[in-house]
Curated annotation (Swiss-Prot):
The gene is cpc2. The keyword DNA-binding does not apply. One of its GO terms (molecular function) is protein kinase C binding. It holds the Pfam family WD40. The modification Phosphotyrosine is found at Y52. The modification Phosphoserine is found at S39, S148, S242, S255. This is Small ribosomal subunit protein RACK1. It comes from Schizosaccharomyces pombe (strain 972 / ATCC 24843) (Fission yeast). Belongs to the WD repeat G protein beta family. Ribosomal protein RACK1 subfamily.
């Protein structure tokens, strides 16, 4: 592998696990992070020698852990999901919450925004998936064909021509949904443990899922078939496709594994030297991942409250 990922910087600002990270295609100089400290931070990526990123705004209002966050594609707004059962929409110019999405009866575990910035999907421990408009009106609650356990992850296809989203749950299922009719297209079974992460490739053709069983499963969204599986051999906390390489990155415990989808092999494993972690205490884990829009920088969120920034180098 001629290209490698090298640890470039760490971002300090949260006082709890960094549960989620998001970037926006139209603004490469910002990063959004959500945390168990109940806050969301908007980072300005200055990339100088002193600071790689500066905390520009801290968004507060949730009364429990922030479990997921998403930037709108135009980067004007942000969404956050929380264990306080709500989703919030934030105006990033003003730094204030403009709408609360109320309707879930248990912790909201995941949130995603459509490529046209107009629709929002959420998944919850109440076992439902809800589709909302951007100002917080619930348009539809999916129960028919839905999950029989916690809905851990929901993600829109980033391809605006592909009106689908996917969901994953603790019922070991991965489900593909039609956004126009809110109907179930396919249920994918194969995982032997709960599924905690699901993601769609940039062109909308592939879906990857992972979780407790340590297996990455690749699904063809056009043909509704299982393509192949990759063994991570560790609990998978988060997944993300590279925007410009045939790479799939998996947060697996205290490391990040990079798989090449052409060779179907692991090509890199990113690890951190944790100083002062005793033999009895476990190492911090990576639990969130996102790429910069140009695919040159991988951001990772950890349970030691840090964001670690990795750069692709030749």
């Amino acid at each position: 592998m001629p290209e490698q990922l090298v640890l470039r910087a760490t971002l300090e600002g949260h006082s709890g696990w960094v549960t989620s990270l998001s970037t926006a295609p139209e603004n490469p100089d910002i990063l959004l992070s959500g945390s168990r400290d109940k806050s969301i931070i908007l980072w300005n990526l200055v990339r100088d020698d002193v600071n790689y990123g500066v905390a520009q705004r801290r968004l507060t209002g949730h009364s429990h852990f922030v479990s997921d966050c998403a930037l709108s594609f135009d980067s004007h707004y942000a969404l956050s999901a929380s264990w306080d059962k709500t989703i919030r929409l934030w105006d990033l110019e003003k730094g204030e919450c403009t709408h609360q999405f109320v309707g879930h009866t248990s912790d909201v575990l995941s949130v995603s925004i459509s490529p046209d910035n107009r629709q929002v999907v959420s998944g919850s421990r109440d076992k439902t998936i809800k589709i909302w408009n951007i100002i917080g009106n619930c348009k539809y609650t999916i129960t028919d064909g839905g999950h029989s356990d916690w809905v851990s992850c929901v993600r829109f296809s980033p391809n605006p021509d592909n009106l689908t989203f996917v969901s994953a749950g603790w019922d070991k299922a991965v489900k593909v949904w039609d956004l126009e009719t809110f109907s179930l297209r396919t249920s994918h079974y194969g995982h032997t443990g709960y599924v905690s992460a699901v993601t769609i490739s940039p062109d909308g053709s592939l879906c990857a899922s992972g979780g407790r069983d340590g297996t990455l499963m690749l699904w063809d969204l056009n043909e509704s078939t299982h393509l192949y599986s990759l063994e991570a051999k560790a609990n998978i906390n988060a997944l993300v496709f590279s925007p410009n390489r045939y790479w799939l990155c998996a947060a697996t415990g205290s490391s990040i594994r990079i798989f090449d989808l052409e060779t179907q092999e692991k090509v890199d494993e990113l690890t951190v030297d944790f100083v002062g972690v005793g033999k009895k205490s476990s190492e911090p884990e990576c639990i969130s991942l996102t790429w910069s829009p140009d695919g040159q920088t991988l951001f990772s969120g950890w349970t030691d409250n840090l964001i670690r920034v990795w750069q692709v180098t030749k």
